[in-house]
């Protein structure tokens, strides 16, 4: 993407009513104005709040919102030029149950309050395969604790990935730490019992993985 196109998207994001772009200082130096008040002050309803972490272009966030009008969806990514597409599509379609936040995922506890989030989706994250990058894996122990701090007591986690490494790493960690695994499969499109909410949505890159014969894995779990 050219620099001019990026700048144009950044400017449009500033005008989009479904895009929130707090600075790091706004989150860490003060109490973020929407923390604990997303339902009341942003969505203006009491529907469950669902997050997609590392949402990229926002395809999954938008499609989840289309299929579930009784839930509110928030895509989180540090690269606003990417989720510009999802934000624009949501506005064009009049989807009022969609929002996007430009921030780092490690700041999630500054954005949401305890018991504010019902579900979290992690879709096709960078597996950070090198050992020295373990701290950046979105399902490591530290990240799981952050998620637990904003999830409701019965909150659900979803991990959908083409990385067999990430799938195996996460399963091992969940077993080792005593978390509750609700469903897991290493190739969801070859399992007739895979949840429709998982197989019914495919992003551009997921379709490419499937065309190349790559299996898509999925884990649904609760953090204890």
UniProtKB/Swiss-Prot annotation:
Identification of the protein by name: tRNA (guanine-N(7)-)-methyltransferase
A Gene Ontology molecular function term of the record: tRNA (guanine(46)-N7)-methyltransferase activity
Pfam families: Methyltransf_4
Protein's UniProt keywords contain S-adenosyl-L-methionine: yes
Reactions accelerated catalytically: guanosine(46) in tRNA + S-adenosyl-L-methionine = N(7)-methylguanosine(46) in tRNA + S-adenosyl-L-homocysteine
Protein residues bound to substrate: 130, 162
Residues that coordinate or bind S-adenosyl-L-methionine: 52, 77, 126
Pathway it works in: tRNA modification; N(7)-methylguanine-tRNA biosynthesis
Residue numbers annotated as active site: 126
Species whose genome carries this gene: Christiangramia forsetii (strain DSM 17595 / CGMCC 1.15422 / KT0803) (Gramella forsetii)
Similarity comment text for this entry: Belongs to the class I-like SAM-binding methyltransferase superfamily. TrmB family.
Gene: trmB
InterPro entries linked to this entry: SAM-dependent_MTases_sf, tRNA_(Gua-N-7)_MeTrfase_Trmb, tRNA_methyltr_TrmB_bact
């Amino acid at each position: 993407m050219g620099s001019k196109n990026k700048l144009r998207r950044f400017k449009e994001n500033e005008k989009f009513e479904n895009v929130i772009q707090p600075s790091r200082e706004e989150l860490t130096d003060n109490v973020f104005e929407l923390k604990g008040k997303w339902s009341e002050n942003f969505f203006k309803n009491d529907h469950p709040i669902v997050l997609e972490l590392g949402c990229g272009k926002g395809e999954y966030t938008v499609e989840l919102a289309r299929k579930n009008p009784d839930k509110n969806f928030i895509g989180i990514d540090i690269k606003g030029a990417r989720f510009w597409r999802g934000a624009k599509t949501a506005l064009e379609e009049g989807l009022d149950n969609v929002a996007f936040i430009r921030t780092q995922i490690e700041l999630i506890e500054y954005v949401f309050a305890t018991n504010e989030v019902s579900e979290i989706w992690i879709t096709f994250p960078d597996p950070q395969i090198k050992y020295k990058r373990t701290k950046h894996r979105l399902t490591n122990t530290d990240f799981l604790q952050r998620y637990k701090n904003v999830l409701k007591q019965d909150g659900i986690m979803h991990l959908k990935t083409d990385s067999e490494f990430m799938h195996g790493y996460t399963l091992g960690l969940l077993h080792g730490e005593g978390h509750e695994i609700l469903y897991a499969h290493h190739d969801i499109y070859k399992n007739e019992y895979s949840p429709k909410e998982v197989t019914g949505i495919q992003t551009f890159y997921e379709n490419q993985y499937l065309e190349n014969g790559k299996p898509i894995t999925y884990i649904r779990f609760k953090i204890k």
